[in-house]
Amino acid sequence: MTTILQINSSARSQGAQSTLLANELTAKLQQSNPGAQVVVRNLHEDALPHLDDAILGAFFTPAEQRTAEQQAIAARSEALIAELQAADIVVIGAPLYNFGISSQLKTYFDFIARAGITFKYGANGPEGLVKGKKVFVVSARGGKYAGTPGDSQTPYLTTFLGFLGMTDVSFIYAEGLNMGPDAASAALAGAREAIAAA
């Protein structure tokens, strides 16, 4: 059975275009994969703490030497990793904030990027250990940045996901959402065309 993991990373609890479009894409993928199981990870509702001394200490302390607090921190990270590893398809709702990703998504990435678990270093450099997944990134944007130096989100996500082994990544953009009603309508229509073709 196909498992679809949808990761919502907007700071908004309601009305986020990236989340709404990610929902539509997940529904489309369910139609294409009858019986698919959907798991939703909402990074707004289930907020993760930013990296600090305690979290780094938990990650870099050998399992048998961790305190109870460190074990709880590591267990949260490992549960997120297991959820990701179990997915066949990953849908990431990723609004463009200040030319990058949300802090919610960055913190999630910090919790799943674990040496020896999701990547490792070998004689030829790093090797991603999260393989065999199709990833869709749905990016909602107030302006138009794709293909310009203002879009640092796309190369960052491509690099990070590829570092973990996820190299089959497709981007769906809804750009110009804050550039007037006509531009917003055109942006959503274009995104929905891409979703229909996914």
UniProtKB/Swiss-Prot annotation:
Reported EC number(s) for this entry are 1.6.5.-, 1.7.1.17
Q: Which SUPFAM superfamilies match?
A: Flavoproteins (SSF52218)
Amino acids binding FMN = 10
Keywords from the named record: Flavoprotein, FMN, NAD, Oxidoreductase
A single GO molecular function, which one? Answer: FMN binding
Superkingdom, natural source: Bacteria
**InterPro entries per UniProt:** Flavodoxin_fold (IPR003680), Flavoprotein-like_sf (IPR029039), FMN-dep_NADH:Q_OxRdtase_AzoR1 (IPR050104), NADH:quinone_OxRdtase_FMN_depd (IPR023048)
Name of the top EC class for this enzyme: oxidoreductase
- Asked whether the UniProt record includes NAD among its keywords, one would answer yes
Q: Which cofactor does it need?
A: FMN
Note on how the cofactor is bound? Binds 1 FMN per subunit.
> Which reaction(s) does its UniProt entry say it catalyses?
2 a quinone + NADH + H(+) = 2 a 1,4-benzosemiquinone + NAD(+); N,N-dimethyl-1,4-phenylenediamine + anthranilate + 2 NAD(+) = 2-(4-dimethylaminophenyl)diazenylbenzoate + 2 NADH + 2 H(+)
Function, as annotated = Quinone reductase that provides resistance to thiol-specific stress caused by electrophilic quinones.
The entry describes its oligomerization and partners as: Homodimer.
Give the similarity note.
Answer: Belongs to the azoreductase type 1 family.
Protein name, as recorded: FMN-dependent NADH:quinone oxidoreductase
* Taxonomy of the source species: Bacteria, Pseudomonadati, Pseudomonadota, Betaproteobacteria, Burkholderiales
From the UniProt record, report the name of the gene that encodes this protein.
azoR
